[in-house]
Curated annotation (Swiss-Prot):
PANTHER family: GLYCOSYLTRANSFERASE, UDP-N-ACETYLGLUCOSAMINE--N-ACETYLMURAMYL-(PENTAPEPTIDE) PYROPHOSPHORYL-UNDECAPRENOL N-ACETYLGLUCOSAMINE TRANSFERASE 1. Keywords: Cell cycle, Cell division, Cell inner membrane, Cell membrane, Cell shape, Cell wall biogenesis/degradation, Glycosyltransferase, Membrane, Peptidoglycan synthesis, Transferase. This is UDP-N-acetylglucosamine--N-acetylmuramyl-(pentapeptide) pyrophosphoryl-undecaprenol N-acetylglucosamine transferase. It holds the Pfam family Glyco_tran_28_C. Cell wall formation. Catalyzes the transfer of a GlcNAc subunit on undecaprenyl-pyrophosphoryl-MurNAc-pentapeptide (lipid intermediate I) to form undecaprenyl-pyrophosphoryl-MurNAc-(pentapeptide)GlcNAc (lipid intermediate II). Pathway: Cell wall biogenesis; peptidoglycan biosynthesis. One of its GO terms (biological process) is carbohydrate metabolic process. It is a peripheral membrane protein.
Amino acid sequence: MTVFTPTILLCAGGTGGHLFPAESLAHALRARGIRVALATDARVDSIASEFPASEVVTIASATPSGRSPLKRAGAVLTLGRGFGVAAKEIRRINPAAIVGFGGYPTVPPVLAGQILRVPTILHEQNAVMGRANAFLARGARTIATGFKVVRGVPDKARAPRIHTGNPLRPAVIEAAKVPYPAFGPDDALRLLVFGGSQGARVMGEVVPEAIARLPDALRARLHLVQQVRPEDLTAVQNRYLAMGLAGIEAAPFFKDLPARMAASHLVVSRSGASTVSELAAIGRPAILVPLPGSLDQDQAANAATLDAIGAALAVKQPDFTPERLAAELTACFATPAKLTAAADAARSAGIHDAAERLAEVVVETAART
């Protein structure tokens, strides 16, 4: 007797912000005995080579933005070619449902699925719906959200909205078990700095100069872990060596970032959806610097959710100066009780079972066909 095993097709662009929640959902679906396939773009190899999918389909994509009409037209043509490939692959895979995680690379496979009448679920990680998801929302059966309140959902999108939270990687769930590390007046102060999956030049420019401005006694207690873009690594390391900072670890990427978050007293970072959700789940206070150039200011909206409950301080990039950061670090480390309260506030906003919640939504939506 042949046993039918349903397949769910996950569609996510090849950056960590989209792939990490898709990876978490894949683990949750596979635990239910469901086969998982992944449709993505060519960047995936550098981010998630061990994605738990039975097969990975690479579909050409592009982002139709920028000022050049020729580049926009070229992007539309690329998306059109991707649509043709996606439609062919969907007929072959025959998924019971398709889940899109946002970003223009998901448009060809999700749109093809909608036209082929495959149930589609959109997961919006940010507090503002991205343009790709907004374009696809009208044809979705269900819209799952990472934040309780999401702006920018089109009026014509009639699908039910379900707040699942953002699915978390197993390493984040494990890190969330670690209590906030208490510290006394003479203890080491552990600061983690990172700029998201693609790094952030501003962190390499501002943070070293802020550290140089700290009081000597405070700087001597500092244990700093900082993600630095490869092209900036030597300059940043030399700057810290010049100021005699011993407890410093700088690298372009940390595979064990969740564990490093859990070991930290304070985090300085961008405010992508995955970062904000992981900070909440692990329960760590943060100084968040939203990416200023995002089309819909989604990172500013994400940061505002933690700022509003006292779990983080949101600082606009023009205000993120060495002087401002040095002052904030000095104030934070001078008041351990305030940091502990911020950690508790962050943890109160965390959703640890988001992957299971989203898996349930996917299974229920697929079953309604």
